[in-house]
Amino acid sequence: MEDPEGTEGEREGCTGWFEVEAIIEKQTGDNISEDEDENAYDSGTDLIDFIDDSNINNEQAEHEAARALFNAQEGEDDLHAVSAVKRKFTSSPESAGQDGVEKHGSPRAKHICVNTECVLPKRKPCHVEDSGYGNSEVEAQQMADQVDGQNGDWQSNSSQSSGVGASNSDVSCTSIEDNEENSNRTLKSIQNIMCENSIKTTVLFKFKETYGVSFMELVRPFKSNRSSCTDWCIIGMGVTPSVAEGLKVLIQPYSIYAHLQCLTCDRGVLILLLIRFKCGKNRLTVSKLMSQLLNIPETHMVIEPPKLRSATCALYWYRTGLSNISEVYGTTPEWIEQQTVLQHSFDNSIFDFGEMVQWAYDHDITDDSDIAYKYAQLADVNSNAAAFLKSNSQAKIVKDCATMCRHYKRAERKHMNIGQWIQYRCDRIDDGGDWRPIVRFLRYQDIEFTAFLDAFKKFLKGIPKKNCLVLYGPANTGKSYFGMSLIRFLSGCVISYVNSKSHFWLQPLTDAKVGMIDDVTPICWTYIDDYMRNALDGNDISVDVKHRALVQIKCPPLILTTNTNAGTDPRWPYLHSRLVVFHFKNPFPFDENGNPIYEINNENWKSFFSRTWCKLDLIQEEDKENDGVDTGTFKCSAGKNTRSIRS
């Protein structure tokens, strides 16, 4: 074994020898060397620091401090890991009866010092669970004993290190408490949602248990509470018997049809109501109304619209309506009759595409969206429209219908002369117009009416060099108003020079009887002078059409409005003989209310053409048989045979 540190009396060995030698040298009285202090006392105090062991103590202190800091940091990491996994820490029994922060906070919040008393910080303000190796508490106890048995320097160092660890632990515990408060709020909201869902689940379960059918099989759920509907299915749980008996009378002022069933369960009377209101209502409005009538909370009701296209659901309402468990009043909804009554089953037919095209042709609808929207609105009165809504290829049907309708219209327009086309347009406009405002407006602009009729007759016939009318004048004189009203009546097309960079900007002229270019500028006049002289003459031109080869057509009559008189401008001498110019000199007049004095609309143009039909030399070719039926009516759908039921 090693010798113990220090001296313990006179023994054999080096230590005892040094002690004897010192005594002998002191007694012999020999000369003392200069290195020794002759004033030193003989008490032996000069040998206290002879062996320097401070280095050993410092090393031990550093190791212990590092271990303590490491343990504190591991404790913090464990706390964060546990809080991240659990999210919710239940309160311990010890803290259940405490006040203040310890009453409402987590178990670790009790280690946070909130008073002004001087309390020594603990080594571990937050409890750390055992790591699993079984020696965590032993190491903590040994570390505390070592700290108490060291010198002052080590105590100060350990207190500083423990203070740092304690402050870090306090901050971590405070942040954990904040996270717990946020998690508590989230948990409360989740509990509220769970509570509401559990009530709804209970209502649905009781309904299926009582009525023997799932409520969700009878309805089509609405996600939004703002969606409006006239027909609603309502479940009400916990209704008193007296209120359930009087509900049929209470609901009549608000509805036009009601189907009421009442059965008893362990939660009270459970009602099932199919109702059609007088006007559309959303779920929130229906919920408030029924809550007042039934005297139950809104959470005790389930409200959804019924399935309208399910034959099974319609049969359920029809059969239960005939039984003695239901009370029904009002007219049965059409969606129930169509799927249950025999006559409606006979009316159901397979979708006829030709009938849909005929409808679009008769109503002069060629736009895809208009065809889809307006034809779907006929589903209640038209069996073919109802069959169209049941189809899974509605988009393709609509696109094909619009394409076929445009083909028929284009061919029909192509085979009409200008007189037939004007008569065709007049037949689609109501009577009651007056031709006088048009004549008065021309006279107001100092335009001779006879000269205008002569030029207008040649314009409509497309005579070369007379195929283009130019309305020239300063701004705000009514040029565009006059020209646009005529184009609107004749169902012409308007082309704009802004699209001249495109190869297809003249394509609308291929499907029109009359065309118009509004507000022609000098740049546009230059373009017309360079590339469109033959178009102004009314001759055949070649037009680039999208997705097709070049199309050769006769250019329809053109109306141009401009602020530049190209008929006399020397910059375009080759246009002088191709233009018929009418000068609009005076500003367009308005009355005190801002309305035009000379109103020019479709009805007035119809009256104008009817009045000047002979002067314009518009000959209508009538092709009628002896019975007076017009053979020119186009039919694109096959005829129908009347079906009869044989007994």
Swiss-Prot record:
EC category name: isomerase
Nucleus listed as a keyword: no
The keyword rRNA processing belongs to this UniProt entry's keyword annotation: no
Quaternary structure note: Can form hexamers. Interacts with E2 protein; this interaction increases E1 DNA binding specificity. Interacts with host DNA polymerase subunit POLA2. Interacts with host single stranded DNA-binding protein RPA1. Interacts with host TOP1; this interaction stimulates the enzymatic activity of TOP1.
Catalytic reactions on record: Couples ATP hydrolysis with the unwinding of duplex DNA by translocating in the 3'-5' direction; ATP + H2O = ADP + phosphate + H(+)
PTM comment, free text: Phosphorylated.
Protein name: Replication protein E1
Chain positions with Phosphoserine modification: S92, S106
GO process annotations (BP): DNA replication
Placement of covalent cross-link Glycyl lysine isopeptide (Lys-Gly) (interchain with G-Cter in SUMO): K554
EC number(s) from the headed UniProt entry: 5.6.2.4
Its biological purpose: ATP-dependent DNA 3'-5' helicase required for initiation of viral DNA replication. It forms a complex with the viral E2 protein. The E1-E2 complex binds to the replication origin which contains binding sites for both proteins. During the initial step, a dimer of E1 interacts with a dimer of protein E2 leading to a complex that binds the viral origin of replication with high specificity. Then, a second dimer of E1 displaces the E2 dimer in an ATP-dependent manner to form the E1 tetramer.
UniProt-listed InterPro entries: Helicase_SF3_DNA-vir, P-loop_NTPase, PPV_DNA_helicase_E1_C, PPV_DNA_helicase_E1_N, PPV_E1_DBD, PPV_E1_DBD_sf, Rep_E1_papillomaV, Znf_lg_T-Ag_D1_dom_sf
Gene Ontology MF terms: ATP binding; ATP hydrolysis activity; DNA binding; DNA helicase activity
SUPFAM superfamilies: Origin of replication-binding domain, RBD-like (SSF55464), P-loop containing nucleoside triphosphate hydrolases (SSF52540)
Binding residues annotated for ATP, in chain numbering: G473, P474, A475, N476, T477, G478, K479, S480
Domain called SF3 helicase: residue spans: 447-597
Localization in the cell: Host nucleus
Motif (Nuclear localization signal): 86-88
Keyword annotations from UniProtKB, A to Z: ATP-binding, DNA replication, DNA-binding, Early protein, Helicase, Host nucleus, Hydrolase, Isomerase, Isopeptide bond, Nucleotide-binding, Phosphoprotein, Ubl conjugation
Signal peptide, first to last residue: none
GO CC annotations on file: host cell nucleus
Compositional bias per record (Low complexity), positions renumbered to this chain: 149-169
